[in-house]
Curated annotation (Swiss-Prot):
It comes from Novosphingobium aromaticivorans (strain ATCC 700278 / DSM 12444 / CCUG 56034 / CIP 105152 / NBRC 16084 / F199). This is 4-hydroxy-2-oxovalerate aldolase 1. It catalyses: (S)-4-hydroxy-2-oxopentanoate = acetaldehyde + pyruvate. The keyword Metal-binding applies. It is an enzyme of class 4 (lyase).
Length: 346
């Protein structure tokens, strides 16, 4: 049934910042404690509803496969918990990567909202994590990654599973930045056919086809109350929907969001952009992610493999897309590069 949320009627959007989680990918998980503290404080003062903090691949994502971080999840979370006054401290967990024990530890630090993330066809593995998070009294969202890879009706059935486990919100998560506005609309309309009106909908956009803001606007018009975004778009690939840009566009439409756009602009330019060792933007490599429908966090791994083996990053990414590789298969990027090198030398 249709979502209870109506942005055009003045209902307030729920702005979820992901600068300190998805943004970890953009800096290879190397945020310092002072960085996360200052960014979180600025976001809190600017009025965002929630701030997500974790390794880019969620709690306990630090590994040889995903990459190690400058600090532990607990150090980052504790630093942010110390400075928040209004925003809800949020984290992300992937069943099979993060355990329920880590979820409990995050709760003890002050996390009160969690997104339980699975590949778009694997909602069934989220049942335990969603259930325990609800038992802890947390706000819980289901996060269906790579939502472009299956048809809207199939995605909606996965969303329905997450709802049945206790998720209070279910996201269309465009991890590859491969959806356009029609694709977002079709998926949220499919959600309407199976989800309860009181179950919130969310959108997590990536900007690989430069559609992050447009997709988020369409999602809100289709009943999505929760909007993921990050300062300067700080995130995997070409980044997420840039928060300050989305809020400016929402202001132009007269939507209710509760954020100060000027403060967000300042935080983006003064605190976040200087940290980018690789510009977060649409360029030939990040565009290839959206074009091929590849998991956005593969970017830095593919660039490293291309440099090591003398290949073009784009050809690696396109081949990963052809093979339909998904999040968690980062170790296969080197295998693909070696296969391509053999073909060149044959």
């Amino acid at each position: 049934m249709t979502s209870n949320f109506n942005v055009e009627a003045g209902d307030k959007l729920y702005i979820q910042d992901v600068t300190l989680r998805d943004g970890m990918h953009a800096v290879r998980h190397m945020y310092g404690i002072d960085h996360v503290r200052s960014i979180a404080s600025a976001l809190d003062k600017a009025g965002v509803d929630a701030i997500e903090v974790a390794h880019g691949d969620g709690l306990s994502g630090a590994s040889f496969n995903y990459g190690f971080g400058a600090h532990t999840d607990w150090e980052w979370l504790e630093a942010v918990a110390d400075v928040l006054e209004k925003s809800v401290l949020t984290t992300l967990i992937l069943p099979g990567v993060g355990t329920v024990e880590e979820l409990r530890r995050a709760y003890d630090i002050g996390v009160r909202s969690v997104r339980v993330a699975t590949h778009c066809t694997e909602a069934d593995v989220s049942k335990q994590h969603i259930g325990i998070a609800r038992d802890l009294g947390m706000d819980v969202s289901g996060f269906l990654m790579m939502s472009h890879m299956i048809e809207p009706e199939a995605l909606a059935q996965q969303a329905s599973l997450m709802e049945s486990y206790g998720a209070q919100c279910v996201y269309v998560t465009d991890s590859g930045g491969a959806l356009d506005m029609d694709g977002v609309k079709a998926r949220l309309e499919a959600y309407d056919r199976v989800l309860k009106p009181e179950t919130q909908r969310g959108i997590h956009a990536h900007h690989n086809l430069a559609l992050g803001v447009a997709n988020s606007i369409v999602a809100a018009q289709c009943g999505a109350v929760r909007i993921d975004a990050s300062l300067t778009g700080m995130g995997a690939g070409a980044g997420n929907a840039p928060l300050e840009v989305f809020i400016a566009a929402a202001d132009r439409k007269g939507w209710n969001h509760g954020c100060d756009v000027m403060m967000l602009m300042d935080a983006a330019e003064d605190l976040v952009r200087p940290l980018q060792d690789r510009p977060v933007r649409v360029d030939r490599e990040t565009l290839a992610l959206g074009y091929a429908g590849v998991y956005s966090s593969f970017l830095r791994h593919a660039e490293k493999a291309a440099e090591t083996y003398g290949l073009d990053t784009r050809t690696i990414l396109v081949e990963l897309g052809r093979r339909k590789m998904v999040g968690g298969q980062e170790d296969m990027i080197v295998d693909v590069a070696l296969d391509m090198l053999k073909e060149q030398q044959a």
